[in-house]
Amino acid sequence: MADPAWWKLTFLKKKKSEAKVLYEIPPDFSNNNANKDLDHDAADSNLDARLEKIVATKSATKGRHVKVSHSGRFKEKKKIRATLVENPSLFPESAQTEKSHVEQ
């Protein structure tokens, strides 16, 4: 008789051979790490600054126009533009003509 759990095989995820790299370690830091003569505090702060810069450049533009709802779906943020009625200072000529139309 066939294996009763054959359907479980359809939901298995394929294992990836390599893990995703979340950050990059600069190559000169790994070379300097072998030398024990360096001041570790200065090297650590230098590495931290570089890692922060890498993360900031990669994640700065991702997901700014998208928000995640409670259900986990992505929703696009829409920019609300100000109308001319709310900001008459943008076009003073049109505001004056509107006032004259209202008065007549």
UniProtKB/Swiss-Prot annotation:
It holds the Pfam family ATAD4. Belongs to the PRR15 family. This is Proline-rich protein 15-like protein B. It comes from Danio rerio (Zebrafish).
